[in-house]
Amino acid sequence: DAADYPGFDLGFADAGNKGFEALAWDARSRSLMLGKERSPMGLFSLPFPGEDGAAGVMQPFNYGNLGMRDISSLSIDARTGHALVLSDESRMLLELDRSGHPVSFLSLTGGLNGLEQGIKQAEGVTMDEEGNIYIVAEPNLFYVFSKAQPDAS
């Protein structure tokens, strides 16, 4: 029964379908990173568990202008602790360091990064321990991005 478990007020009760869209676990800080889709768009950190075993206090994650129109998914690179921020409307994946500064980006536009056509509605992103990036998109599309292997010759 859900009533047996604590609830968490994440705020933005009036956001409708523009509330929290993305969620990622940050093992280094033992916190959840949450992404608010838009109006206003935002990134937040929620320590979990807090000192008393409950969720801590949600804090805004400091970042500059992301250059994105929305946030559709988040992932944390376990190797670096960097955040991967996916925007379906901007057709972009942005890497932020732990201070919120952009490190790199991956355009999801057709004609770039091996894509014949752009990824129109990217909805989810994750990364494995080797740095391969996996993106799911509507309708039922799956993409894998891997760094090119050096030529052995």
Predicted regions and their residues:
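Sequence/structural signature of beta-propeller domains
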Residues: 1-153
